[in-house]
Amino acid sequence: MARRAASRAVGALRSDGSIQGRGGRAGGSGAEDARHVFDELLRRGRGASIYGLNRALADVARDSPAAAVSRYNRMARAGADEVTPDLCTYGILIGCCCRAGRLDLGFAALGNVIKKGFRVDAIAFTPLLKGLCADKRTSDAMDIVLRRMTELGCIPNVFSYNILLKGLCDENRSQEALELLHMMADDRGGGSPPDVVSYTTVINGFFKEGDSDKAYSTYHEMLDRGILPDVVTYNSIIAALCKAQAMDKAMEVLNTMVKNGVMPDCMTYNSILHGYCSSGQPKEAIGFLKKMRSDGVEPDVVTYSLLMDYLCKNGRCMEARKIFDSMTKRGLKPEITTYGTLLQGYATKGALVEMHGLLDLMVRNGIHPDHYVFSILICAYAKQGKVDQAMLVFSKMRQQGLNPNAVTYGAVIGILCKSGRVEDAMLYFEQMIDEGLSPGNIVYNSLIHGLCTCNKWERAEELILEMLDRGICLNTIFFNSIIDSHCKEGRVIESEKLFELMVRIGVKPNVITYNTLINGYCLAGKMDEAMKLLSGMVSVGLKPNTVTYSTLINGYCKISRMEDALVLFKEMESSGVSPDIITYNIILQGLFQTRRTAAAKELYVRITESGTQIELSTYNIILHGLCKNKLTDDALQMFQNLCLMDLKLEARTFNIMIDALLKVGRNDEAKDLFVAFSSNGLVPNYWTYRLMAENIIGQGLLEELDQLFLSMEDNGCTVDSGMLNFIVRELLQRGEITRAGTYLSMIDEKHFSLEASTASLFIDLLSGGKYQEYYRFLPEKYKSFIESLSC
């Protein structure tokens, strides 16, 4: 009899195991299998082991906390005669309640555990502590750990304390976290000393709050206690240093990390790459990418995306595309954000052909455009003035089942307003509201700007009143933005009307409003009106500032009324408003433009004696002014002095001197300066190459021109349509048809257009048949074009 009972028990266990084997991990069919296993075991009642039920319940909980709670309730209803939940069962239940955001039910379940006489351990409290901290109730969690757990005879462990530390740091209470850490270390933590996670959490908390000193202090305290940092600790420190662009220190920490036997991971390298990019050191970033590979750490999508983002934001899309291609060759699949980065880069540069090529590739790879990508396309067309194409993209978006969001509508409304199609913009505005989307200030700004531009003042005022009815705050900043846009477009009359409307509805103009309007009149050369605004500003109790006076002085300088500018400059100082370096720059420029070089030199001496920090822009103005007034030797002397100063020069400084030296025939000195770019840590820019190209062509050194062009591309300086057209014109004028044909091909390859002056010269020189023997050297489309003219 006993043997038969034992046999039945063994059979039950085997059967139980076979059922459990059909379970699995969460997700897909595994989760479904776990549900079936639990249901089958529960039907057995006494024949099922609690271990098997708990295992199945845990698998169900991973996929669906609600489904797990439902099955627990069935288990509880079955009663103690069938199967009795144990502490593990309750632990799963508490975890499910907390994950579902029902802390109240989680605490109720814990109360049931205590009521049933179970001895609870620290693990049972873990999900409740996490839930409280996630709800920003860390103080309640601390009360449980520091008081209630001990009252129940439960000793908190290091995991309990680490949850509190993270909760405090997430609430920007890192100082309290540090005090708790010290309590743990001083043996007041119930025998749970801090570990590497404890210290890393607090260090990271201080970094997030911007308190680097306390973060480093905690790091050194950690080392003093003999706790070795892990990769997460080092990553926190390196990421913070890179964010502060302290790249030398970040590299020191990296070297220490490796020396201590902690191997950097992809996140470590990504932080340093991001640091190099954000601090404008792309060469170092690319060099570090190579080091990353040589160290055996494979770059991920984030790594490549960081570099691409930097390059695209700096207009270096060709280099970004090379990195993109390198990424795909290595088998990494770009995400939609990666495509979006490069698409945005192409859109910003107006490279629509490349943009569409990448978009096609993206779709072929199974990634469909989202709202962000469609917005990029719409804005790209808008920038090129191709409104119809932008609207076609908007229609395609709807066809693909994507409902436009507020950002997309904002882009479309903005485009239509800028192109004068305000009525169409209003239709989309109404459609947007009908679809339940709330227009923000940007949308209203576009519409009001568009209506004002079209002289639809009544409708603009209606829209402003509508905004007030909708409870949208119409403050000074909102009006300043629209007034500024109109002023920059030369619509100062419209700006004045907006100013009057602003006052009429009770929004008070501030100093910025007056400065903006004054700038509008100055840009239009209407200095009398600008000066009236200055008087009006003072009459309402607003005090003109440095920007006010600098704007007016600049206005006078622009129309060569230098005496008036100097009178206002004296008035500025007598009013107690101190000039800044921008004010001085304006006056220096005005003096040089009116050939008052002696006065400019005197002002420079005065600036240096006043203790004002002189910027490189000031030196550039002086160098340019001296050169324009044929004082090249004086300029060269100042330039040489600048090279000896602790001042980082820029390409513009070199360009000013190269241009001046070339114009007075000092070609060798100009070439020496061109070569000196690299020794000063600089790269020649577009204007440098254009200056050198003009000189080389002028001297007939055409072989050097080709070499210069190659070095330009090697240095990552992108040639544009203007430069290629210029080179073609110069070569055509010299009768260098063969070489001109080479550069014409480049214009075609880059999808640029011939400028009118280039096309006119081309026709004049070649349509008469004078250079017939050179036809074969021209790109095919130009041959047929010339032949059609000859007929």
Swiss-Prot record:
PPR repeat residue numbers: 86-120, 121-156, 157-194, 195-229, 230-264, 265-299, 300-334, 335-369, 370-404, 405-439, 440-474, 475-509, 510-544, 545-579, 580-614, 615-649, 650-684, 685-719, 720-754
SUPFAM superfamilies, sorted: HCP-like, TPR-like
NCBIfam families, A to Z: PPR
Function noted in UniProt: Reduces the expression of the cytoplasmic male sterility (CMS)-associated mitochondrial gene ORF79, encoding a cytotoxic peptide. Can restore male fertility by blocking ORF79 production via endonucleolytic cleavage of dicistronic ATP6/ORF79 mRNA. Promotes the editing of ATP6 mRNAs independently of its cleavage function.
A GO cellular component entry from the record: mitochondrion
Keyword Mitochondrion tagged: yes
Molecular-function annotations in GO: mRNA binding
Region (Disordered), start-end ranges: 1-31
Source organism, top-level taxon: Eukaryota
Composition skew (Gly residues), residue ranges: 20-30
Cell compartments where the protein resides: Mitochondrion
Transit peptide interval: 1-27
Alphabetical list of PANTHER family matching this protein: PENTACOTRIPEPTIDE-REPEAT REGION OF PRORP DOMAIN-CONTAINING PROTEIN, PENTATRICOPEPTIDE REPEAT-CONTAINING PROTEIN 1, MITOCHONDRIAL
Protein keywords: Mitochondrion, Repeat, Transit peptide
Protein name: Protein Rf1, mitochondrial
InterPro entries: Mito_RNA-Proc/Resp, Pentatricopeptide_rpt, TPR-like_helical_dom_sf
Keyword Transferase: no
